[in-house]
Amino acid sequence: MAAAHKVFELSHVFKDVSKIGDDESVCSPNEDYFGVPWKIVLRHKDEKMGVFLSCEKPSNNDAHCIVNVVYSVKLMSSSGVCYIKSDSKLFGEITEHGWVNFVNWNTMVDAFLIDDSIIIEVLVKTIFMSGLPKKSPKNFDESNKEFSDGIVVVKHQNFHILKKFLAFHCEYLEKLFFGDFKEAGKAEVTLKAISSTDFHYLLAVLYEDYAIDDDNVGGILRLASYLQVPIVIRKCEQFLIEGSGKPMEIRLDIAEKECLQNLKKHCLSKVGTADQIEAARAILPSDIPKRALKKFDESNKEFSDVIFVVEHNKFYVLKQILASHSSHFKKIFVENVDKREFTLADIDSNDFQNLVEVMYGVSFIDDLTVEGVLHLAHMYDRPFPMQKCVEFLIDLSEKSPKEKLKIAKAYQLKNLEKAALARINLPESIRAALSCDMAQMEVEVLKALMQKALFHLSDTKVHTETFF
């Protein structure tokens, strides 16, 4: 699978352009992506029109931020003429990149100025990001008490957890909580010789509340290997393959130490010699095996306290997992405290299986499952799975922009709509998007597509080069 590059688009109509004096600049409003404010800067200097992409350091972040991007700047006119320049730059100490002489000022006035206004569009694809602000991981202090039945103490820090949920993911903790250990049955257990920070991150990843990154992946992976938590090991490996900015040599070293065969194969294919690659192919699987469905049948009864019946299939699950992510199910459980079995009508059991897997953190959404999971997440008011579906559709899905626009309209997903529109730039993709029932399109979407189509009506392209 390709690396999960982030793509977004900035677009702004600059008005009263004739009033911009020499050596003056005007800016578009800041737009926040990945916790960083971005904007377009238009500058008039020495009869030249400069255009710059600005990536400012967040005011609440003291870390050294680095963002490597490829970007394409397009100056557009309603007559169909467009002028494009592209580049690849590293934002860090330097927060602004672009062209002092994007186009001659008089050329801009003659060819692009309409009603004293011009339209500038910037398409950005991130290659690597580091030091950006992160959201704090989920708290497992007393505020999480409602959704817990036990306490794990690490370095004098109390973590309020759900025993059956952790036991479901970790055989060691299953034995600790419910086996022959002296701690079994106790409300509070202590884990020694591990970092409380790493344990906090591991819990947050298990609860699907925190993203693995280059700063924490080492600690999370070591602890997941020590406690043998397969799903977290798998997620760390996937990040190191798809999203890490660490040098390949370092990732290969991690793969060797932690026996991550898919990561090892990936690294050797990037940096190894022909002999090394051939040797790796001989001992490693050619493809990542298709995952087996996680069973929520009677074999999971020990780690459940409620049953859902869907199309005659019984799913043994934990109330707290469903209630913690869905106000709909929380209300059902509150109103039916003593009820053990519930029936859900008019939904597909495969979709429910996929949804529960996402809630338990044992499945990665893909193009085959995303719409079913999204449908049920929307139906049962589950923001977390919806967020995961949107992230997948924006970052990893191979669905066409037309398909994504259709999904965005069905579930009112504005971020997905904007991301899909940003990827519609070639004439064939514009035609494909416009081939659907335009009467069903949102006015703003139709307007954006028609505007893009207009840019391609003219055969005149003053300059076109792009990395996209």
From Swiss-Prot:
Keyword vocabulary terms for this entry: Repeat
Q: Does the keyword Protease apply?
A: no
For this protein, the record's Pfam families field holds: BTB, MATH
| InterPro entries documented for this protein | BTB-MATH_domain_protein (IPR052664), BTB/POZ_dom (IPR000210), MATH/TRAF_dom (IPR002083), SKP1/BTB/POZ_sf (IPR011333), TRAF-like (IPR008974)
The record's annotation in Gene3D superfamilies points to: Apoptosis, Tumor Necrosis Factor Receptor Associated Protein 2, Chain A (2.60.210.10), Potassium Channel Kv1.1, Chain A (3.30.710.10)
Describe the location of the MATH domain by residue ranges: 7-124
Q: Which residues form the BTB domain?
A: 148-215, 304-368
Family annotation (PANTHER family): BTB AND MATH DOMAIN CONTAINING-RELATED, MEPRIN/TRAF-LIKE MATH FAMILY-C.ELEGANS
Q: What is this protein called?
A: BTB and MATH domain-containing protein 45
